[in-house]
């Protein structure tokens, strides 16, 4: 064999090796997503992921969010297919940890060191199963399962709703109030409209609704009349086709909580309830020189709550309170100025843990529901009740002491 023939044979073998390597690479990169994913979906709607491969070589499946990987697993295909179960739980844990309700995600497959983007999609947090159309739901509903609720003059309420990129939403407030000497004290409707602005991305918009703001809508048309002459009966909030109504009760509820609901947004829960305080002490006893001494003492307190009558709708809504991973004890708001709006944040309020509950919901006519639950503060150190120390408290030195016994 001549030298030229040897060179040609060598080049032919090199070409075959290169061609074989390129063929193997092409085969390795043949990865396809067989599951259909919507561009926008609730977390509970994320299906099991099925990825088809052209061979049985290993494939790494990754889920990315905000330029970092939150899930990564190496799989070996069976029958040229990889199936990932319950990816929705990974997404929900991530959203809960970030205290957010909506994020963009990217699903990737990595084979032979090369990454292939299989899908990009947006997820909105929802723990419970949802079978309707997500677009229609978001256009017609705030992120709550209630259409209305009782509120009080000291309450700060939150409403959240979805705004698509490029959309412009207008919020309209309607207050039903009576003013003495105006129309004979008959209820009238006062309105305010504000624009939420536009954004280049999908977002969850938060509305902060207070009795003080609603009172401000009425005070101007009331022509300087004192607040005692103004009675607010209810106020409603409208954003597009969405609507929510707050009915005002004069007295403050004995127990007020904020909790992250099924959509992972804070919602206020005012309860007419009786609370039983149960302090206890966990400690050990040591005996030294025949003298007993306490040590390792830990003071704790549990609170047992029994609510008054609840409608079926209220009881089903409060069920989300028991499922919630983040429950806060509402603190008193002292400042309602415009400068403080947005700073009243339940995230900075004392966290509580609902350790036990009894919730049996029925829909019998003429009979209301009642739920019981037990909670304790996440910080095991007990709290000092200071409301009675206030100089403005109505129980201090406002009535004479009368030692009357039966």
Q: Where are the model-predicted features located?
A:
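Extracellular/virion structural assembly segments
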Residues: 2-6, 30-39, 162, 217-227, ...
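Preference for solvent-exposed, low-hydrophobicity sequence contexts
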Residues: 1-253
């Amino acid at each position: 064999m001549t030298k030229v023939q040897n060179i040609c044979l060598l080049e032919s073998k090199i070409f075959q090796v290169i061609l074989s390597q390129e063929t193997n690479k092409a085969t390795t990169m043949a990865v396809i997503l067989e599951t259909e994913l919507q561009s926008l979906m609730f977390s509970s709607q994320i299906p099991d992921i099925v990825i088809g491969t052209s061979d049985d070589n290993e494939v790494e499946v990754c889920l990315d969010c905000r330029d970092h990987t939150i899930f990564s697993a190496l799989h070996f295909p069976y029958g040229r297919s990889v199936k990932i179960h319950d990816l929705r739980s990974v997404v929900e844990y991530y959203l809960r940890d970030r205290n957010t309700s909506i994020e963009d995600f990217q699903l990737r497959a990595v084979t032979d060191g090369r990454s292939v983007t299989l899908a990009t999609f947006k997820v909105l947090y929802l723990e419970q199963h949802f079978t309707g159309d997500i677009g229609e739901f978001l256009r017609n509903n705030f992120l709550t399962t209630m259409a209305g609720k009782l509120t009080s003059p000291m309450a700060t309420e939150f409403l959240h709703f979805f705004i698509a990129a490029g959309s412009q939403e207008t919020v309209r407030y309607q207050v039903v109030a009576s003013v003495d000497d105006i129309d004979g004290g008959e209820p009238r409707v006062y309105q305010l409209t504000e624009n939420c602005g536009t954004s280049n991305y999908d977002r969850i918009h938060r509305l902060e609704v207070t009795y003080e703001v609603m009172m401000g809508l009425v005070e101007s048309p009331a022509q300087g009349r004192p607040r005692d002459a103004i009675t607010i009966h209810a106020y409603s909030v409208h954003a597009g086709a969405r609507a929510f109504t707050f009915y005002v009760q004069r007295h403050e509820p004995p127990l007020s909580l904020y909790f992250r609901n099924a959509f992972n947004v804070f919602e206020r829960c005012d309860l007419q309830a009786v609370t039983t305080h149960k302090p206890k002490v966990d400690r050990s006893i040591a005996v030294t020189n025949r003298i007993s001494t306490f040590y390792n003492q830990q003071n704790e307190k549990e609170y047992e709550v029994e609510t008054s009558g609840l409608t079926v709708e209220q009881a089903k809504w409060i069920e989300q309170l028991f499922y919630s991973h983040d429950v806060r004890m509402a603190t008193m708001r002292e400042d309602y100025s415009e400068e403080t709006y947005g700073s009243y944040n339940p995230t900075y309020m004392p966290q509580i843990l609902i350790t036990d509950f009894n919730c049996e919901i029925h829909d019998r006519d003429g009979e209301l529901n009642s739920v019981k639950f037990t909670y304790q503060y996440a910080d095991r150190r007990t709290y000092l009740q200071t409301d009675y120390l206030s100089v403005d408290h109505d129980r201090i030195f406002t009535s004479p002491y009368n030692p009357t016994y039966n």
